[in-house]
A protein has these predicted regions:
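Transmembrane-helix exit segments and adjacent C-terminal regions of multi-pass membrane proteins
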Residues: 1-2, 6, 242-247, 266, ...
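Transmembrane core module of solute transporters
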Residues: 1-45, 49, 150, 222-230, ...
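Small-residue-rich transmembrane alpha-helices and their cytosolic helix-loop interfaces
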Residues: 6, 38, 42, 122-136, ...
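Interfacial helix-cap and linker-helix signal at transmembrane-aqueous boundaries
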Residues: 23-24, 55-56, 141-149, 203, ...
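Hydrophobic/small/kink-forming positions within alpha-helical transmembrane segments
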Residues: 43-47, 77, 132, 136, ...
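C-terminal module of multi-pass small-molecule transporters
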Residues: 55, 60-69, 78, 82-90, ...
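Helix-loop-helix hairpins in multi-pass membrane proteins, especially solute transporters
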Residues: 57-196, 205, 214, 222, ...
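C-terminal membrane-cytosol helix-exit motif in multi-pass small-molecule transporters
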Residues: 159-178, 195-208, 233-249, 503-511
Length: 529
């Protein structure tokens, strides 16, 4: 039941991403509006996750999970009947995002309270598998339902599933929590929400606005993109949040986040590795659809089918993760998983081309899924086993906050790699293309230097044909652009492989054995003794 909730809470983001074109047409809006709705969902999740974890300690984990899922169901129902983008924003971005922020931290705390030892490790392996399968299956389900039926049916189905989950959650016992109901730090909640939202917004919009040099930035302070200013604003607010938490602790009042938690080495390692995992996951799932859909021209459903080996391997590896951790230890399993992700990224780099290398691509996808499954199967158990019952929801809030930050960073960093390499390579190809007149090459170089989007070659051809160029010139420019697409994707995949290698550093303080984590449990009482 809890695994079903985990799938549900990650599934519809993938569905929404593959339904953008249909939503634009049916809701009579623009692509930028739907992208704004998707961005807003991420912002709401990031802003409220820490507070959602604290509310789990205050209200009780089962009650908070129930409230979160109920809010999520209302959001799904609102989304299903949305007549326009405004209602879609309220239903999907605000209500579903807030519901997920309440439910997810309590979900992992409920698992921790329901299982012990190896059974807990197995349960978190199942949750990891559920989350990964939701991400990977989403494009298949979304593509099929959107193409054959209606995107609205996905959200109707979510309402039905939530009702089933709510009926089943009554069978769960309330796990142990804090001995005293903690006070809710409202000022801290606002500061953390604003700070995290600004940091995530900067990361998500960096590709559109530009990192430093402005692209489509709404304003250009001092001639720069808005991105660094939004990011710096978020950092300043978060610094204020940290200072406020210290002040409350010194006054003997409950903070939103106990800063002493970050001195817990296994917890810190679990959070950092979770951030790295989602950076890699979202970076790869940003890159792969670009190749399959915009380079090869596959539709959403066929794209999902090509990614199916990821889902299958991820499921198998996640379920096997608990037994592997019992034999080799969580640290070793995570390190092997990260190494497999690195090799898979290099493998995809080697096999992508103008034509799909079907068997080789499927093998690399299976390797990628195996690596992701090994990592995902360990981190929930590491985080929850490093704290005691009183801090589980708080740790869960931090866990999902780290994952949301990683997701935003993955999209931003890999997106910047793709577009930066695409622009540089396309400019170099055009400048060296002797099929083009010198005047055309010079003019194109100026236009390309401002940045080019990643689009399918048919769209590029139509745009060039409308620019009063000859057929030969259009053919040459399209060929140069197609070459630059592959170079851009390969550069990004090389970057992902490098990030996977760097992520090994975050694993240094992960437990070497499954039975090592409980002996390092952190308790809020320990810091106040």
């Amino acid at each position: 039941m809890l695994a079903t909730a985990q799938v549900l809470l990650v599934l519809d983001t993938a569905v929404m991403n593959v339904s953008i074109g249909t939503l634009v047409e049916e809701l009579d809006t623009e692509v930028v509006a739907i992208q704004g709705v998707i961005t807003a969902y991420s912002l709401v999740m990031a802003a409220l996750m820490v507070t959602g974890g604290k509310l789990g300690d205050r209200w009780g984990r089962r009650r908070t999970f129930t409230i979160g899922m109920a809010v999520y169901a209302v959001g799904s129902a609102t989304t299903a009947i949305a007549p326009g983008v405004g209602v879609l924003l309220i239903g999907w971005s605000v209500l579903e995002g807030a519901g997920a922020a309440l439910a997810l931290p309590s979900l992992v705390a409920l698992v921790a309270g329901s299982y012990q030892g190896r059974e807990r490790a197995t349960a978190y392996g199942v949750l990891g598998a559920a989350a990964g399968v939701g991400v990977a299956v989403g494009p298949i389900l979304g593509g099929w339902v959107t193409t054959s039926l209606s995107w609205r049916l996905v959200f109707v189905g979510e309402v039905v599933l939530v009702l089933v989950i709510l009926a089943g959650v009554r069978l769960l016992s309330e796990p142990p929590g804090p001995a005293r109901r903690p006070e809710l730090d409202l000022v801290g909640a606002v500061l953390s929400a604003v700070g995290l939202a600004l940091v995530v917004l900067a990361a998500l919009q960096a590709s559109a606005w530009g990192w430093l040099q402005p692209r489509s930035s709404p304003v250009t302070p001092l001639g720069f993109s808005l991105t660094p200013f939004v990011f710096a604003g978020g950092v300043v607010v978060l610094a204020g949040f940290v200072g406020w938490q210290r002040r409350r602790e010194e006054a003997g009042r409950d903070p939103l986040v106990r800063l002493a938690m970050f001195t817990n080495a296994p917890l810190r390692a679990g959070l950092l590795t979770g951030l790295a995992q989602n950076t890699l996951l979202l970076g790869l799932f940003f890159t792969l659809p670009l190749y399959l859909q915009l380079v090869l021209g596959l539709d959403a459903f066929r794209t999902g089918v090509r990614l199916l080996p990821v889902s299958i391997a991820l499921l198998v590896a996640s379920l096997a993760g608990a037994s592997l951790a019992g034999r080799f230890g969580p640290r070793t399993v995570v390190r092997v998983g990260l190494a497999m992700i690195m090799v898979a990224a290099l493998g995809v780099l080697a096999v992508i081309g103008p034509e799909l290398a079907g068997a080789a691509f499927a093998i690399t996808m299976a390797l990628l899924g195996t690596g992701m499954g090994l990592v995902a199967s360990q981190l929930g158990n590491v985080v929850q086993s490093s704290v005691d019952d009183a801090a589980r929801s708080e740790a869960g809030g931090l866990q999902f906050t780290a994952q949301n930050l990683g997701a935003a960073l993955g999209t931003a960093l890999v997106g910047a790699m793709v577009l930066g390499s695409l622009t540089a390579t396309f400019g170099a190809r055009v400048a060296a293309d002797e099929r083009l007149e010198p005047a055309l090459r010079a003019d194109a170089a100026v236009r390309i230097s401002a940045g080019v989007p990643f689009a399918d070659t048919d769209t590029v051809r139509d745009a060039l044909a409308a620019a009063d160029l000859s057929d030969d010139e259009v053919d040459a420019l399209v060929e140069d652009y197609a070459d630059a697409q592959l170079v851009g994707l390969r550069s990004a995949l090389l970057g992902v492989a490098a990030l996977a290698l760097a992520a090994q550093a975050a694993t240094r303080r992960l437990p070497r054995r499954v039975d090592e984590a409980p002996t390092t449990e952190w308790s809020p009482d320990a810091t106040s003794a």
